[in-house]
């Protein structure tokens, strides 16, 4: 929990040791965050989600590369329903080491294969970004990118509704890690890209 003052007044040996630890992967650089009620939340080791002390993460993903435009809503609602159903049945709170599911009300649905999905419809990141911007402003784009942005917006909205109905305080995450994507294929048999990353 280093803040600006602590860093400013730390001696050079301490700074060097911290930077070395971050560079070698032994120390994670993470922001100090609070939930909407002002309670401290902490970055998980993967840095994909922030959790309360003794909180756990329950993550799943939607493989966009395995979806068509017409599949998105069902993929997101099914995945969120599965997460919310599994949430109370993990037994993770029984040990006393972690928060119980009645207290720790969060799941994390992420996505992978965005570039695979966009490739299928010949949509550039630029066009998709512009279409998303318009959709977020309440407008629409009358092209393939606009159709994809609207379909994704509806799918995420419907999944969020399921999370709300299950009293989840968080429903989405930057998940999963890259290793999940490399084991996933798109509709054409190509390896999926991680998270929402472009191909490398």
What are these regions (language model features)?
Residues 1-200:
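Long, C-terminal-biased catalytic regions of enzyme "large/alpha" subunits
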């Amino acid at each position: 929990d280093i803040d600006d003052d602590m860093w400013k007044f730390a001696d050079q040996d301490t700074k060097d040791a911290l930077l070395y630890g971050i560079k070698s992967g032994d120390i994670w650089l993470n922001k100090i965050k609070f939930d909407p009620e002002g309670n401290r939340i902490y970055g998980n080791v993967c840095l994909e989600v922030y959790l309360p002390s003794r909180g756990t993460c329950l993550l799943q993903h939607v493989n966009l590369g395995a979806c068509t435009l017409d599949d998105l809503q069902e993929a997101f609602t099914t995945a969120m329903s599965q997460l919310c159903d599994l949430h109370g049945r993990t037994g993770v709170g029984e040990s006393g080491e972690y928060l119980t599911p009645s207290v720790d009300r969060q799941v994390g649905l992420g996505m992978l294969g965005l570039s695979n999905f966009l490739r299928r419809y010949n949509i550039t990141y630029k066009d998709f970004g512009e279409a998303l911007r318009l959709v977020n402003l309440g407008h629409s784009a009358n092209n393939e990118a606009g159709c994809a942005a609207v379909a994704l917006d509806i799918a995420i909205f419907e999944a969020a509704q399921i999370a709300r109905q299950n009293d989840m305080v968080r429903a989405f995450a930057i998940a999963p890690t890259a290793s999940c994507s490399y084991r996933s294929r798109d509709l054409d048999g190509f390896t999926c890209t991680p998270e929402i990353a472009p191909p490398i």
